[in-house]
């Protein structure tokens, strides 16, 4: 199984999480699995698989248990606390020259990774760029393959005749073994086989988008000054439009240089111009601009961009691609240059939103400064038994509360008595009677819906027992500290 990589040769790390819910900041991971391959998808190592049990301030979404079949009690028996779980993943991801790839990982799995690292004093970002690392998302490549070069792949459709990009549907339609969907290891194997299929059937497309996955390479496709249109493949445009459009890059965002402000040339540009001429800038919302055709492309999220020449003559009817009309619209934008500055200024509003008071939701408020980064590294290298001795002068106000939660969630026994009381009170406040009543009602409702399904009934019954056990545990901790 083991293959030896040449120095500086790219390797792929295919990975997937199963989680206890769909919120990437507030919900918790249940399982991580990864498989490392060489550039030709030959497996180089045994799969890595880790489980993580939830902390005392959290209960899983019952619906997630029914999807994955992973109960919190199972993770308590076979898994780690979130710090140990995160550290193991960190060690896997940081291997040099790794392209970290999954299926919908840019929007989901990578966000889970960032958030667990943020909560556990590991750098949330360096895993994706340090040591010549990068990331990529096969789901976006699959969408591009369907839109631009669909031959050679069997495409599942829904009842409306629209393409479905669910991993389990694609594997079934293309006779790819996928023995246990929503088990992380099974999903990783299936993703590798799907990548092999696309590379085999459409090698030029695969290699092109692999080459243009990083910001520096993507910037070579963008020429704002010459008003050069490009193809953008994204779920933003919807399946009716083949998840694709021709866009015109306008400018870089004033606040975030990773964001390319563009116009969707499929839309009626006249409407946008009239609207911006007749409505005061103070009354124009970001939603207004999006509805009228403004599109934001995040270059740090591996967007699928390509030159307009990728559309062949035989593709134009299938894609309803009207090159002549797009260039007419570009000329209209040139004549109304005021649009560009107006849009940039309206988009500045998006950065004026109030931040959440919950530190778990504050990962993107700002980057930590050099001083705090050094303290974060120091914490990550400190034994749990020595954490209580640390004297830390954080500059960023988030870190004091993060450090407290980090200790409480992972190493409760090292807390001082007053800290234990504070944590237990926080847990009781989070799992209050109103929340628990609604939570138990949801489980009982699902028990009625799935009364015919023995497996799901057992999962929900086990979860109900877990809820009472957890509340009793937290309640008795509170009694003992009183």
UniProtKB/Swiss-Prot annotation:
Every Exonuclease domain range: 13-194
Reactions this protein catalyses: Exonucleolytic cleavage in the 3'- to 5'-direction to yield nucleoside 5'-phosphates
Positions bearing the site annotation: Interaction with single-stranded DNA: 114, 125, 129, 143, 215, 258, 300, 364, 367
Binding positions (Mg(2+) 1): 16
Swiss-Prot/TrEMBL site (Important for interaction with ssb) positions: 149
Annotated cofactor note: Binds 2 Mg(2+) ions per monomer.
Protein name: Exodeoxyribonuclease I
Gene Ontology MF annotations: 3'-5'-RNA exonuclease activity; 5'-deoxyribose-5-phosphate lyase activity; magnesium ion binding; single-stranded DNA 3'-5' DNA exonuclease activity; single-stranded DNA binding
Domain notes: The N-terminal exonuclease domain and the exonuclease C-terminal domain form a central positively charged groove which binds the DNA.
UniProt organism field: Buchnera aphidicola subsp. Schizaphis graminum (strain Sg)
Binding site for substrate: 18
PROSITE patterns named in the record: EXOI_C, EXOI_SH3
Top-level taxonomic group: Bacteria
Residue ranges annotated for the ExoI SH3-like domain, each copy included: 203-351
UniProt binding sites for Mg(2+) 2: 18, 187
Cofactor annotation: Mg(2+)
Assembly information from the UniProt record: Monomer. Interacts with ssb (via C-terminus); this interaction stimulates the exonuclease activity by recruiting the enzyme to its substrate.
Residues carrying the site annotation Important for activity: 182
């Amino acid at each position: 199984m083991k293959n030896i990589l040449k120095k500086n040769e790219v390797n792929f790390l295919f990975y997937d999480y199963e989680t206890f819910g769909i919120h990437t900041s507030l919900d918790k991971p249940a399982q991580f699995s990864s498989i490392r391959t060489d550039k030709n998808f030959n497996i180089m190592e045994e799969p890595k698989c880790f489980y993580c049990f939830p902390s005392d301030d959290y209960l899983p979404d019952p619906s997630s248990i029914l999807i994955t079949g992973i109960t919190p009690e199972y993770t308590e028996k076979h898994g780690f606390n979130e710090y140990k779980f995160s550290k193991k993943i960190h060690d896997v991801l940081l291997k040099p020259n790794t392209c970290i790839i999954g299926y919908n990982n840019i929007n989901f799995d990578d966000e889970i990774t960032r958030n667990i690292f943020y909560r556990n004093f590991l750098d949330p970002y360096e895993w994706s760029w340090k040591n010549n690392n990068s990331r990529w998302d096969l789901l976006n490549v699959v969408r591009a393959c369907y839109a631009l070069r669909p031959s050679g792949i069997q495409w599942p459709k829904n009842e409306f005749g629209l393409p479905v990009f669910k991993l389990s549907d694609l594997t079934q339609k293309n006779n790819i073994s996928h023995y246990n969907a929503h088990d992380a290891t099974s999903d990783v194997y299936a993703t590798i086989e799907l990548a092999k299929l696309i590379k085999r059937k459409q090698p030029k497309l695969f290699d092109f988008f692999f080459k243009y996955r990083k910001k520096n390479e993507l910037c070579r496709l963008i020429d704002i000054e010459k008003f050069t249109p490009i193809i953008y493949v994204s779920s933003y445009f919807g399946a009716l439009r083949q998840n694709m459009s021709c866009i015109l890059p306008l400018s870089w965002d004033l606040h975030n240089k990773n964001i390319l402000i563009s116009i969707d040339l499929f839309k009626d540009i006249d409407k946008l111009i009239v609207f911006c001429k007749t409505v005061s800038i103070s009354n124009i919302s970001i939603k207004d601009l999006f509805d009228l055709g403004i599109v934001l492309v995040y270059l740090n999220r591996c967007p699928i961009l390509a030159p307009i020449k990728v559309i062949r003559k035989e593709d134009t009817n299938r894609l309803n691609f009207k090159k002549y009309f797009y260039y007419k619209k570009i000329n209209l934008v040139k004549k109304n240059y005021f649009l560009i500055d107006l849009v940039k200024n309206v988009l500045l509003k998006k950065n004026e939103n109030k931040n959440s008071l919950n530190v778990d939701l504050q990962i993107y408020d700002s980057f930590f400064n050099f001083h705090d980064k050094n303290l974060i590294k120091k914490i990550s290298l400190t034994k749990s038994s020595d954490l209580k001795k640390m004297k830390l002068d954080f500059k960023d106000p988030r870190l004091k509360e993060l450090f407290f939660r980090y200790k409480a969630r992972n190493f409760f026994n090292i807390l001082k008595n007053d800290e234990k009381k504070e944590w237990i009170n926080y847990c009781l406040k989070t799992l209050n009677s109103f929340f628990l009543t609604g939570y138990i009602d949801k489980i009982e409702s699902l028990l009625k819906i799935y009364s015919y399904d023995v497996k799901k009934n057992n999962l929900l019954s086990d979860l109900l027992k877990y809820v009472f056990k957890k509340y009793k545990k937290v309640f008795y901790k509170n009694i003992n500290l009183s």
